Amino acid sequence: MAKGEFRLCDVVLDDTIGRSTPDVEHERAVAIFDLIEENRFEPLGHAGGPYRLNISLVDSKLVFAITTEEGGGVATHILSLTPFRRIVKDYFMICESYYEAIRSSTPSRIEAIDMGRRGIHNEGSQTLKDRLAGKIEVDFDTARRLFTLVCVLYWRG
């Protein structure tokens, strides 16, 4: 396969959940932009993309619906949210502290909170990468951006 075939060309979040705060919507936009710009996304057993990914929450489960760029069905993977609940809860709490700190704290306090935020985000990213193993091969940076989008769905919901 030629380089670049196993990548995402479009990512859509379930719009039925609605919009969130400006901070959350900014996180969503940046994550999608960065994800489309650079990613490794290989649905195992498929000949190659590029791919479109629709991410949604259905019956408290995470759904990754994958099609080719032209819209041909590739796969739908449904993941339990249970392994993510604690991580996402911790991530939300530290993000609230981070956004508050940006508005009113010292640079050293912001940096300390941001280090904790990145650590929790890395944990969630690795958990997502592990849960996708055997279904979709992604690199760590792709998993990080996808985890951000999973968090956005939680925030909206």
Curated annotation (Swiss-Prot):
It holds the Pfam family UPF0262. It comes from the Bacteria. Belongs to the UPF0262 family. This is UPF0262 protein RL0614. It comes from Rhizobium johnstonii (strain DSM 114642 / LMG 32736 / 3841).
